Each structure stands twice: as C-alpha cells, then as structure tokens.
Amino acid sequence: MPATQQMSRLVDSPDGVRIAVYHEGNPDGPTVVLVHGFPDSHVLWDGVVPLLAERFRIVRYDNRGVGRSSVPKPISAYTMAHFADDFDAVIGELSPGEPVHVLAHDWGSVGVWEYLRRPGASDRVASFTSVSGPSQDHLVNYVYGGLRRPWRPRTFLRAISQTLRLSYMALFSVPVVAPLLLRVALSSAAVRRNMVGDIPVDQIHHSETLARDAAHSVKTYPANYFRSFSSSRRGRAIPIVDVPVQLIVNSQDPYVRPYGYDQTARWVPRLWRRDIKAGHFSPMSHPQVMAAAVHDFADLADGKQPSRALLRAQVGRPRGYFGDTLVSVTGAGSGIGRETALAFAREGAEIVISDIDEATVKDTAAEIAARGGIAYPYVLDVSDAEAVEAFAERVSAEHGVPDIVVNNAGIGQAGRFLDTPAEQFDRVLAVNLGGVVNGCRAFGQRLVERGTGGHIVNVSSMAAYAPLQSLSAYCTSKAATYMFSDCLRAELDAAGVGLTTICPGVIDTNIVATTGFHAPGTDEEKIDGRRGQIDKMFALRSYGPDKVADAIVSAVKKKKPIRPVAPEAYALYGISRVLPQALRSTARLRVI
C-alpha cells in the first residue's frame, strides 16, 4: 500500500502528560517507533523517514517538554522512568496488538533501555536499534568497574575519560541558568549550525522551536545525571534484556566513547554492534545507515537470511577475520591478484574476482571453491570506464557493495620512451592508472554512499619511486597511482573508508612473460634472450606473489596507508625519502 501522509494525535501518559505523536508510512507494514533525544524533536528523523516509509508504518513522537507535547514543571517529571512510561503509552495506543521495532537516539534511547528493564517488555518490542544512548546501568557499571581497577591503566584511564566527557551534564543540571543559556544560545543560527559539526545543511533537521524545546527539556539532566550514579543497578542485579538489540556506535561521538559499550553484551545476549565514523548526530549525517539497520533487523525478525553487515555485527559469533565480508579483486587470473583472492578466501571472505582472461579467472574461482570458499568470476577490462561502472553496478546488485576493493590489474612495458609506440604507452597508462581510477570511482562512490566504511587497496610498485629509463610507461603509471592514492586517501577518510597503497618489489610472477619489449634495431632473438634473463632473475629472487597477498591482507587489517613489499622495496622507499638524488641516478640503468 502507498505510504500515507503524516498524521498527528495526542496520547496521554500515566502522569497526565500529553505526548504529541506523528504517524505515517505504510499502514499495513510493521510498526517502527522513532524516538529522539536532547535537544531534538521528532523532526530529527526527517532524513530517515523517507527510507522507511514504503515498508513500515512509522510512529514518532515529541518527548515531554518538546514540540506539541506537554511541558511538566517539576524536574522529577523528566526521569527515565517517565520517558519509559511515555514510550509504553505510545506503543500501547498506536500498536496495541503487535510488537514494534524501535530506533532511538540519545536520551530517547536511554528511555527505551529503561523500558526494556520492565517485565513483559520483550512481548512489546520486536527489536531495538540504539544510537548514542547507552543504558544508564550499563554505562555506570563500565565507569565504576574501571575506576575500581587503577592497576589496569588502560581501563582506568578510559573510565576517567568517559566520566569527564559526561561532566557537561552537571552544568546542564544548574536550574534557571542552564535553561536561560540554552534558550539564548540556540536562538543563534551559527550555534545551531556548529552544534552538529560538518553535516551538510540540507541534512540538518531542527524544529522551529528548538531553543524553546531545549530550555524546557534540559530538565532531563538534573532529573537523571546525579541519580544515575546513586540508583543504577550493579552487576548481576541488572536485568537481562531479552530483546534483539543492535548498537550503532559513532566513533567520533564526543560524549559516549565506543569503549563505553564494551560490556553491553553482559546483559544483552542477543547483541549486534555496528561502528561507523560519525559524530553524535548520526541520524542526520547517516540516515541511510539508520534505515539499513532497521531493515536488516526487521528482515531477521521475519526469518530472512541476515545480511553480511548484520552477520559481521553480531557480537560473540565465531567467524574468520574477514568472514561475512565481500572482497573484489581485479587481475585475479594470475600472479598477485590470484594469490590475493586466495588469501582473503582463507580468511573467510566471499570473493568477487575479475580478469580480462576468462579462462584464468574461472580457474581462480574453481581453486577457491575447491578449498571451500565462495568466488564469483567476471570478465573485465579495467581500462574501460563504462565497463567498470557496469561491473560495479552488477556486482552491487547481485552480491552487495564490496567491503574491500583491491585494484590490482596491471601490465608491463619495456623500452625507451622514444622507441615505444604511442598506443602501447597509452595502453599501460590506461590499465595501470586508469584501471585504478575507474575502480576507485565506481566502488568508492558506493562505499561512501553506503556510509559504513570499507577499504580500498591500490597496487602500485616500488617503480613508483625508483625511475628507470627503460620502464618509462610502467614507472609513470605506478608513480601516478601512488600519488592518486595519497590524494584519494585524504578524501575518503572522512567517510571512514581506508586506502592502502601496495608497493611490491621484484616479485616472481608472469609479468615479465607478458610485458611488451620495444627495441627497434634489435632482433627478436636478442629480445627473447633478454626477457629470459630478466625472468630468470625474478625466479632466482624467489619472492612469490603469495607474500604480496599476505602483505595486502595484513595491511588491510592494520589499516596501513602505504605498504612496501620485499626488502628492496622498503630500502628504495627509504632512500627515496632521504637521498632522492641517488635514486634519480638509477634512471640511467637500462632493462634492454
């Protein structure tokens, strides 16, 4: 059924406070309740609602003291117990016969945690997605537990840090002064803008009554802050939450740090956790992540196969390091690409492999399958931008957006620049540089739009910083890849997408056999002889592509920005930084 327009009503809470409730979306769909925190209103969810409206019946409401809801005067009317009463009243009237899915932020989330402590809550709540609003019991136990163990410096210092990050609540608890200052401050457009950080203006959702709402609802702080330290339950006295819960943990939240959630699993046996690179107001900055999390949880409740993202997020579930992870590797028919695909498969990943040679990429897929892995082979010319975009579209539709993208495909070219045909020089740039650019554009955009991070690996070479006159096309393409990766890394960092540049040294692959040699005036026999000498040198080096693959896997785990591979690659990398003139002199060396 088509989504309906927003409708509103007032619901009475047990203490007589009237709660303004808004409902919209699919009237025949499952109900999802969206609960906001401070200083927001139901408007906080304006970016999320369109992503849920087709499937869900959406219920959201203004907390007491906010918007069209009543404004009780006593501070005691703003305890989390009252917030839980409000939530109970809303779902009791709007969804009396069916359990609801819940997405809640900040104090709204804390109030839902309070509700889940109550008997029978698991019959009313089908799932709970919590954003930047931990249970008071859980967080206080984390802090007290750390402070009691000064002999564990890391735990002790984290507990102190978390306590200090919440100390602003004491200031917000000062009567008269706090409401007045908030009303004045939030009347300023500049303050409202700075409060949410660098979120694009069109994604900022504040009500017109934000300043007034904040002045009224700031009573939430004196009603709960000091009380939480004295009345929170401890250890085994904390009730077990028998509801599926997923935490969306914002790594840049200045108030509740990621480690503040580390003990949640003690009291929530069915727990999922998604860490994203976002600040406190992630419902505005990452609405697609909020919506995807709700959809995934609803699918799970419906008995559908959980998504890879949900499987990865499940706390306590045994899996390989890259289990439930999708990895794309280009140039996977042989050499470094093939070994990289095999290495990630050993770590539990599903692999999307591509190569311009259909026979070799299918052989790699068969090898992965024979070892118990899963691989999806594709034929791809990475130099064709349209083909790469179509490939990315198809892969994303059939398997999902890859979590890790390895742009490896490359070719060699030997010969002096003036001896190399223009089309051959351009082909090297098109594959070695263009292939990387095309892959980053196609998949990088999708990773950013998805909003949950990821990792890109661009395979360059030590040739990026070790020039050779007989490898001008190859060195140029790899140096450009190196610099392009440095630039893109800084751009993608804001979205939580990592980027590693791999710089292999002399690696024993088939690249020499497939490299074009151009030396006018030299007969083919001499060229073949020289090719054989170089090939033998690579073989005697005995440094195989499997070692590069292991380095790639390790670099992704450790989030390394640059990773030379092989001793000579490390040595030349260091020399390029300390004695660049020494390396420039090596450019005089000739391969042929």
UniProtKB/Swiss-Prot annotation:
The gene is ephD. GO terms for molecular function: oxidoreductase activity. Residues 30-286 form the AB hydrolase-1 domain. The keyword Oxidoreductase applies. One of its GO terms (cellular component) is cytosol. It comes from Mycobacterium tuberculosis (strain ATCC 25618 / H37Rv). PROSITE patterns: ADH_SHORT (PS00061). Belongs to the short-chain dehydrogenases/reductases (SDR) family. This is Probable oxidoreductase EphD.
